[in-house]
Design a protein with these regions (language model features):
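Beta-strand-rich binding/interaction modules
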Residues: 222, 235-327
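Hydrophobic helix-coil surface modules that form long, contiguous segments used
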Residues: 1-85, 114-117
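Amphipathic alpha-helical substructures
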Residues: 165-251, 275
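Zinc-dependent metallopeptidase catalytic helix centered on the HExxH motif
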Residues: 70-134
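Loop/turn elements at helix/coil->beta-strand transitions in domains of secreted/extracellular proteins
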Residues: 10-12, 47-53, 89, 183-188, ...
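Second-shell loop/turn segments in exported
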Residues: 19-29, 70, 101-102, 162-165, ...
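Generic, well-ordered alpha-helical scaffold segments in large soluble proteins
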Residues: 33-44, 74, 83, 87-91, ...
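Acidic/His/Gly-enriched intrinsically disordered linker/tail segments
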Residues: 109-174, 178, 182, 199
Length: 331
């Protein structure tokens, strides 16, 4: 069966699938959803530059090509949408930006995973935070397995297939999720649009993405790109000590892993109020703006990356504090 559905900006969406009663309903239903997905990518990445795109039943799982994806799904609607969304996202990152898949596979697969899941959550009304947690879980599993290799490893040089897959897809996803955390949502959105419009059809490198993010945020990010992609250093922080200091409380944090990261520490009080304490790292030479989820936001002095411990004060006696959490959003 060949159906044609009109997508955004007059793009012709072709759907080729088997004449099988078990799948026809889902393949009909996915057509307007595909148009919504394309509209989402247009709005959040940049405009799709071609006049057509085809979704074809075939292959094994899903596979992207320029202006075409093969999808071997149909019995269930949500998996069909999920794979279509991921493969369609490749039209921007593999088809238009066209990063080198051998040297920087995470720039395509990680971005397609991140934006594919983000678009899916938008059109289906699902919770994108679940995708974030799943990607973190897969990355952490790899990081704790002893099989992880640096993300800058050539795609053909990974010792284990699992290491390639988790590094390209999950760790690539987490790279973008953490970038959004570091520079803030507005700067992140601006970064992606400027990156696409600046580097489409030019085969950008990781440093090109970094520079665009720095320009959009006013934050230096070489430390982030270096540690995350060229090493297997891990991010791990803990609360080391909490003590009374006259009418204030001193909170001492400890960096356990080798990789530095700006921190958001949420202090909840017994009276029901709460306050975020934002700790930039000195390598950033800047800071992000107060996020919408933080009702109260206090920026304290930078944490110099070389020091393992850091202490800051809270304007409350210890007995009035209910809880202290590092990065409570988990994002």
């Amino acid at each position: 069966i060949h159906d044609v559905y009109e997508g955004p900006n007059g793009v012709k969406l072709n759907f080729y699938y088997k004449n099988d009663p078990k799948i026809i309903e889902n393949w009909k239903a996915v057509q307007p959803v595909t148009a919504e997905l394309m509209e989402f990518f247009n709005d959040n990445i940049g405009v799709y530059p071609y006049k057509q795109y085809s979704v074809v039943q075939g292959g094994d799982g899903g596979m992207e090509y320029s202006m075409l994806t093969l999808v071997n799904y149909g019995d269930e609607f949500v998996p069909l949408v999920s794979v279509t969304s991921h493969e369609l996202a490749h039209a921007w990152f593999q088809g238009v930006l066209a990063t080198n898949e051998m040297n920087h596979e995470w720039m395509d697969e990680g971005a397609a995973s991140f934006f594919g899941d983000l678009a899916e959550s938008f059109v289906l009304g699902s919770n994108f935070n679940n995708s974030i947690r799943s990607s973190y879980a897969r990355y952490i599993s790899l990081a704790n397995s002893g099989q992880e290799m640096p993300q800058s490893t050539n795609a053909n040089r990974y010792k284990y297939n699992r290491a390639y897959e988790s590094t390209a897809y999950s760790k690539g996803f987490v790279f973008l999720s953490q970038l959004r955390y570091i520079i803030g949502l507005d700067a992140f959105n601006e970064t992606i649009k400027n990156y696409y419009n600046t580097y489409k059809f030019t085969h950008p490198l990781p440093n090109d993405l970094r520079r665009i993010a720095e320009q959009s945020s006013g934050i230096l990010l070489n430390w982030y790109l270096t540690d995350w992609t060229q090493t297997t250093n891990k991010i791990n922080y803990a609360i080391n000590q909490v003590e009374q200091s006259k009418n204030k409380s001193k909170i001492t944090l400890e960096r356990i892993g080798l990789m530095p990261m700006p921190l958001e520490v949420l202090v909840k009080y017994k009276d029901g109020t709460e306050e975020f304490y934002y700790i930039p790292i000195s390598l950033m030479r800047g800071e992000k703006k107060q996020p919408s989820y933080a009702k109260s936001w206090t920026q304290v002095k930078d944490w110099s990356w070389a020091y393992k411990k850091y202490t800051f004060e809270v304007n409350s006696r210890l007995e009035y504090i209910k809880s202290i959490d590092i990065n409570p959003t988990g994002l």
